[in-house]
Amino acid sequence: MKKTFVCYYHIIKELLKVIFNQKKYYHNYITCGEKSIQIRKDLEKCGIKFRIEIAPEIYGLEIPAVIIANHMSTLETLLLQGIFPENVKCDYILKKELINYPIFGKVLSVLQPIAITRKNPRLDFEIILKEAKNLFEQNISLIVFPQGTRYNIISPEQFTTIGVKLAKHYNVPVIPVALVTDAMGQGKLIKDFGKFDVTKEVCFAIDKPFYVVNQKEAMNHIVSFITKKVKEWGRTDLLSNCE
């Protein structure tokens, strides 16, 4: 419990800095990325170990992309912008209710996230197409969690094609991301914020970009990459029917 308190102390401390100095962070993906890096450093001080693997091709990327990752906890929403190098500025497609959260929601709103309800898939996709165009024109990439919600057990049928459809529509590349972030658990009262287990390693792997030709093949490639990395990290306990 003490470790959890200290972890949240550091997270909230950094998020409040964003709220009280919004002019510095408003639509500024560099400073928000730096804040994300600071949160990671603070969590390292709490005892959490990180493993980060980035394909060399990412460092030379000069165009926007659709970043497709599995979804395990709120931790990736806090950290992913600081995992990518500065040349890849990115924002999120996320559930609308997150914007209404105290502190966390205000921080997310500093940038330009695309908020959807997940109640009407067709309407959600229309919103995404409209708002994504504006972000891509600013060379801002979009992070998509196609599972729709957090899962501790990864299974292929959880993944929707929303990310690959978006990438194909605008002819931008896809960047697969595998992650394990169950060091931050799910809460009993508020699902998004649970206890920390500092004995669990937090892992991120960013694959090289590719263009979508066939949506099914693209999804198979993404899920295969995620599965492979989770196995390499010794976390087969998180996999279900992903052979």
What is the predicted function of each stretch?
Residues 7-10, 14-22, 61-120:
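Catalytic core of membrane glycerolipid acyltransferases/transacylases, capturing the structured
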Residues 64-66, 139-145:
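Residue-level preference for the first positions of well-ordered beta-strands
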Residues 70, 95, 147, 179-180:
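Cofactor-binding loop segments of dinucleotide-utilizing enzymes, especially the Rossmann-like FAD-
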Residues 105, 141, 153-217:
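A cross-family acyltransferase "interaction/gating" segment
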Residues 1-66, 78-79:
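Membrane-anchoring hydrophobic helices of lipid-metabolizing enzymes
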